[in-house]
């Protein structure tokens, strides 16, 4: 009987495995479209973080029309630049150009005077703390997730990042605290907890440029206000870019950019 049951299980698993194998093969066969320059430049040693968009336009590969059209602005250290607009206006696409998930179709983006296409992706991303809308967590524990971008970080840095991100309360409520297990993708924590841990990870990295892509959307109003107040003190010397839907999230921004159908409707 057991042999028959095993045979039935195999007959179910094999087709699923074949489909999964096709998907894995498709990923492995994909060509990288973003490349490092053959003779890469480097950033100056001084910590700055000034980000300049100069007449930036972008369209997805194979598309006929630009989704971002002629965007020009400067985000300065010590200031918060907020980007708002309706759904589909190009907010996330715009900030995804900064870590070079895509390259601009026209114009340029410079960081501290260097075109981001002229440095390696590793060096560029070392300067960035990026928090996507959907908090991304890895299998491991809370500590390893927060210190992912700063593996040599101290316990003091770990706890400070969690405190600023308003994650301390729910972490300390767990029996194992910072050693608590995190499932792949963070499926064993809530959406708000996932976002707070992702924010804590960016804080613990000590980047020059913070990018929050609607990263406060799953937080309640009180937590949102408290977190942003603590974050303002922590990022006083950094460049902060926030994509948001809620007006309350961007009230303290020094610069607000309004996008409409991929174009700047106001600043």
Regions found by a protein language model. Give the residues of each.
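Pre-NBD coupling/linker segments of ABC/ABC-like ATPases
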Residues: 33-46
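ABC-type nucleotide-binding domain
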Residues: 44-267
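Conserved E/DxxT/N motif and adjacent residues on the DHp alpha2 helix
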Residues: 26, 33, 147
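Residue-level recognition of oxygen-bearing side chains
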Residues: 16-19, 33, 202
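Flexible, glycine-biased helix-capping/connector loops in cytosolic signal-transduction modules
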Residues: 2, 30-33, 176
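Cytosolic ends of transmembrane helices, especially the final helix of ABC transmembrane type-1 domains
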Residues: 2-27
């Amino acid at each position: 009987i057991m042999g028959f049951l095993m045979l039935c299980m195999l007959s179910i698993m094999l087709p699923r495995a074949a489909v999964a194998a096709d998907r894995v093969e498709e990923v492995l066969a994909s060509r990288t479209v973003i490349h490092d320059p053959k003779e890469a430049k480097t950033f100056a040693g001084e910590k700055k973080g000034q980000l300049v968009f100069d007449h930036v336009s972008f369209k997805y590969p194979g598309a006929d029309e630009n989704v971002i059209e002629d965007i020009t602005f400067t985000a300065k250290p010590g200031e918060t630049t907020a980007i708002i607009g309706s759904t589909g206006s190009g907010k996330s696409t715009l900030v995804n150009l900064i870590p070079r998930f895509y390259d601009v179709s026209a114009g340029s983006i410079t960081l501290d005077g260097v075109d981001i296409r002229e440095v390696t992706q590793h060096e560029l991303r070392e300067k960035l703390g990026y928090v996507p809308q959907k908090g991304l967590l890895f299998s491991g524990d809370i500590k390893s997730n927060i210190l992912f971008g700063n593996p040599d970080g101290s316990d003091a840095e770990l706890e400070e990042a969690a405190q600023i991100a308003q994650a301390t309360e729910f972490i300390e409520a767990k029996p194992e605290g910072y050693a608590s297990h995190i499932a792949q993708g963070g499926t064993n924590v809530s959406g708000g907890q996932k976002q707070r841990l992702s924010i804590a990870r960016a804080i613990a990295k000590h980047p020059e440029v913070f990018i929050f892509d609607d990263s406060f959307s799953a937080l309640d109003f009180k937590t949102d206000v408290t977190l942003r107040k603590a974050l303002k003190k922590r990022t006083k010397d950094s460049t902060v870019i926030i994509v948001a839907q809620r007006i309350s999230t961007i009230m303290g921004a020094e610069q607000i950019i309004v996008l409409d159908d991929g174009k700047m409707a106001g600043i």
